Design a protein with these regions (language model features):
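Acidic (Asp/Glu)-rich catalytic clusters
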Residues: 100-107, 143-153, 204-209, 237-238, ...
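His/Asp/Glu-enriched, well-ordered alpha-helical/loop segment
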Residues: 259-343
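Metal-cofactor-binding active-site regions of metalloenzymes
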Residues: 80-86, 90-91, 105-132, 160
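C-terminal cap of metal-dependent C-N hydrolases
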Residues: 334-386
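Histidine-rich, glycine-flanked metal-binding segment
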Residues: 1-53
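Active-site core of metal-dependent hydrolases
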Residues: 163-284
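Metal-associated gating/positioning segment near the N- to mid-region
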Residues: 46-105
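Divalent metal-coordination and catalytic microenvironments
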Residues: 7, 27, 49, 60, ...
Length: 386
């Protein structure tokens, strides 16, 4: 039995916030409580001074083998406390099927959005994907969801569209309208990338339904979340009211510190905090870097640590339909656990890579060092100092 003792457990789903022990037996959580008994046969780890949280869910990344530019899935996820990752549309209906066997062998739980482009993002970084609805393989998309969608017990959770002006071109928001219409026909949600949109962000938000996700919510390329008065646009509040999810997934350029500061000051916080990392952006300072660094950045921006953990555990688990298997530390559920050591140090967080134009930075004073990751009761990452 694995017993993690004396850690400060933060579990928003169960409203746990305090120092407790947690025991995992086999692949599941057995018990959480004070001063749990242990024997010489148990693997006992002292987590005093550390936070113990549910295994993180990175709701937006691009991972191998689904993406040519994908990050190394297990190595990058486990080293940052991530036990569930969502690939955000790296593949389309022509190539998703060929990766099923590999996904089944990964210990990380990989969920995925299916790109409306038949070949997904395979053309990147050389050229942009073709999202013209006239070129969609609608029958192929339907077949993918029939075979591999959540209703069939698979990993596909919805449709993905990047609606940047250079991608949709003269079609503008018609592509998003058609994507949402297709999502309605298939009974799935839509994730839309909004950086550099082809028109006012307000018009984009009006198209989205309850359960859809707008990602890169704090981007600052093209029309953004903040109006000329410095206020969050009313259409964003209206979209949230009707159940649209807002995701902060920042990558190297899908984030603007002034936009985030203004929105957070007005109480417009993310539903999900993710990375949108690839092998081109993982571990790159001063941008998204990893989920651990995203936690540090958003706490530096003024969001309480407990709320940030909610945005990286319970909230995405609910949206993905995984509350019975991820996003909480619940007895009888899979033992997916992450342990972070708070380290007080100055860290620069930026919204563009070093040397880029129009870069803004802030200085944070605390980072959260991943020291232990447990997946299904197995220690899959442990820092040498822990």
């Amino acid at each position: 039995m694995l017993i993690i003792k004396n850690g400060h457990i933060v579990d928003p789903m169960n409203k746990t916030d305090g120092v407790f022990d947690i025991a995992a037996e086999g692949a599941v959580i057995r018990e959480i409580g004070k001063d749990l008994p242990c024997t010489a046969k148990d693997n006992v780890i002292d987590a005093a001074g550390c936070y113990v949280v549910p295994g993180l869910i990175d709701h937006h990344a691009h991972v191998q083998p689904l993406a040519k530019i994908g990050l190394p899935t297990e190595a990058s996820c486990f080293a940052s406390g991530v036990t569930t990752v969502v690939d955000a549309g790296s593949t389309g209906c022509a190539n998703y099927i060929y990766h099923q066997g590999i996904l089944e062998r990964l210990r990380v739980n990989v969920q995925a959005y299916l790109n409306v482009c038949t070949t997904g993002l395979d053309s990147l970084p050389g050229c942009l994907e073709d999202v013209n609805p006239a070129h969609w393989d609608r029958a192929g998309i339907k077949e993918c969801f029939d075979r591999f969608g959540k209703k069939a017990g698979g990993r596909l959770v919805g449709l993905k569209l990047r609606t940047s002006a250079p991608i949709v071109k003269e079609l503008g928001y018609k592509v998003l309208e058609e994507t949402v219409k297709l999502g309605e026909e298939l009974g799935v949600s839509v994730m839309v990338h909004c950086t550099n949109p082809p028109g006012p962000l307000a018009d984009l938000l009006k198209i989205l339904r309850k359960g859809d996700t707008i990602t890169h919510m704090y981007m600052n390329i093209g029309p953004d979340l903040i109006d000329e008065k410095g206020e969050v646009i009313k259409e964003a509040w209206e979209a949230r009211e009707r159940g649209v999810y807002f995701e902060a997934a920042d990558a190297r350029a899908h984030f603007g510190i002034p936009v985030a500061q203004a929105a957070i000051a007005q109480g417009f916080l993310p539903d999900f905090i993710a990375t949108d990392t690839t092998k081109l952006s993982m571990n790159l300072r001063p941008t998204a870097f990893s989920m651990a660094m995203q936690i540090a950045k958003y706490t530096a921006l003024g969001i309480p640590f407990e709320k940030v953990i909610e945005c990286a555990t319970m909230n995405p688990a609910r949206q993905l339909g995984l509350l019975d298997s991820a996003g909480s530390l619940t007895a009888g559920h899979p033992a997916d656990i992450a342990v972070f050591r708070p380290v007080d140090m100055e860290t620069v967080h930026g919204d563009r890579p070093y040397g880029a134009e129009n870069q803004h930075t802030i200085v944070g004073h605390r980072v959260y060092q991943p020291v232990l990751t447990v997946k299904n009761g197995e220690m899959v990452y442990r820092d040498v100092t822990f």
